[in-house]
Amino acid sequence: MALRKSVTLGTLKEVQQAVPREMAYTKGIKNSIEKKVKEAQKHLLENFEKHPVTIEIASGPQGTNVSGTLGGIGNLFSYIGVSAGDKPLGPIRIMLKQYDIRMHHSKKKTTINITVPTATEIFRVTPLPWATGRSWAKGIETGISGLGTYLNIDSSRSRSGTGIQTKGKQRAGRFKNRTYLSSLLKNYYKEIRKIEKTTIS
């Protein structure tokens, strides 16, 4: 037989008073954690914007190969095959600004879980226009073939308007891989893990 427990008005009042305090406590913690996450995010975005690859692609089809990936020939915007007027960096910026903070309370402490985009998720929003399933952002780090047949000229056949792939070989040489998003994100994740390890008693 189940025992019934009566709730006195005094007990009910204590519970009602405790709920707002608990909500205020949780909100205060979340605001503090969010401030730290935004600071780490700010550093990530600053490093992303000043990276030579970002600068070069942001310069569009008339940019120069400041990243050194093409041996000074043409630019990444036209080499990747981005259509004139497109903003290939936009989806990356949107993803880098995303985060989710969740907290789990116990009697002794509050555990923090922070979710931010992975490199794999970002690679999915940076497709190579001419190679289904491949990412240009990942290709910066692993290599993008075609430098030998790349011709940096104004052409109506070009997506960007300033670069085409020819049938015959134009030069020797190969794409020079560069560290990019994976490296930037690795440092970002270290900062996020430090914030997560913060336990609040």
Roles of regions detected by a PLM:
Residues M1-S201:
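Short, Lys/Arg-rich flexible segments
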